[in-house]
């Protein structure tokens, strides 16, 4: 029984090692594209935003500048989503841990904050007619829905969810499960993006809320610290955490440990800088405007 267990554990690694020999000769299978449901959701999010913007534009004479800025933020975030989920980077993540880290960082520290700044919920709502907007608004005002949304977007809860998603999925058993299963991989990316959206909404979207900018700066700083700690663990480790990658990073000229160290550095340095930069921007705005944030910008 023990031999059977060891065989089953080693089988995926052996299969991938065999694949590498063929791929080293032919080159990695990289290209644009994604699963149909990913492409559908990307297209739907953009179409609804454009429809909402078109419907709201004639009614917003005094706020068109803000709408243009929000649309630019959303467009940039949407492009980052496409880059992370439908570009060759997605396929490269199955060959190299470092490419996978680039993909995750794009989702969490580029796409997510840009989408939050784009205020998509309001624009998506305006994509529907008056009756549809009233129906959706009535549904979201139900006590259970409001309580759930309030709990998810409470700054401490959003911070904890983002922390838990990041650390849980980098546990070797969980990360390798995502490598071995398309369903688990989709769940991993969904949890990364969803938790990052909640985190950035708590930091940026609720500006002027009870925690204020001081609290937002603390959440950004502590996130920089724990993500940097995880990146440092990858960088300084003397052994590979994810054997399922095997020698596939050789396709990009990297050994397994070099690939892992590069991935750790990507999470540690550029990833940490993004949280630091966001915190410094909020701090500068806080000092410029005074401790009382402008409540007019608190909601989409």
Where on the chain are the PLM-derived regions?
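Hydrophobic h-region of N-terminal signal peptides that target proteins for export
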Residues: 8-17
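Sec-dependent signal peptide recognition
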Residues: 1-9
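Alpha-helical membrane segments of multi-pass proteins
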Residues: 2-3, 16-300
């Amino acid at each position: 029984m023990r031999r059977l267990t060891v065989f089953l554990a080693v089988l995926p690694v052996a299969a991938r090692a065999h694949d590498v020999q063929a791929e080293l000769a032919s080159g990695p299978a990289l290209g644009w594209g994604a699963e149909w449901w990913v492409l559908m959701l990307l297209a739907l999010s953009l179409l609804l935003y454009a429809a909402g913007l078109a419907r709201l534009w004639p009614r917003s004479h005094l706020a068109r500048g803000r709408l243009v800025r929000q649309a630019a933020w959303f467009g940039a975030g949407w492009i980052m989503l496409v880059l992370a989920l439908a570009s060759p980077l997605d396929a490269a993540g199955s060959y190299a841990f470092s490419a996978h880290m680039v993909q995750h960082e794009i989702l969490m520290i580029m796409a997510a904050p840009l989408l939050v700044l784009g205020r998509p919920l309001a624009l998506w709502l305006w994509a529907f007619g008056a009756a549809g907007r009233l129906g959706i608004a009535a549904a979201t005002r139900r006590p259970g829905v409001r309580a759930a949304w309030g709990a998810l977007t409470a700054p401490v809860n959003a911070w904890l969810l983002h922390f838990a998603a990041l650390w849980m999925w980098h546990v070797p058993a969980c990360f390798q499960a995502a490598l071995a299963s398309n369903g688990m991989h989709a769940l991993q990316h969904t949890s990364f993006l969803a938790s990052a959206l909640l985190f950035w909404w708590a930091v940026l979207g609720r500006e002027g809320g009870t925690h204020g900018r001081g609290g937002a700066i603390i959440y950004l700083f502590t996130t920089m610290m724990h993500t940097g700690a995880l990146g440092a663990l990858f960088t300084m480790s003397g052994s590979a955490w994810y054997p399922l990658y095997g020698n596939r990073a050789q396709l990009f000229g990297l050994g397994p440990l070099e690939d892992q160290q590069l991935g750790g550095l990507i999470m540690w340095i550029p990833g940490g800088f993004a949280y630091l930069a966001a915190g410094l921007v909020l701090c500068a705005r806080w000092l410029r405007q005074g401790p009382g944030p402008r409540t007019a910008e608190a909601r989409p």
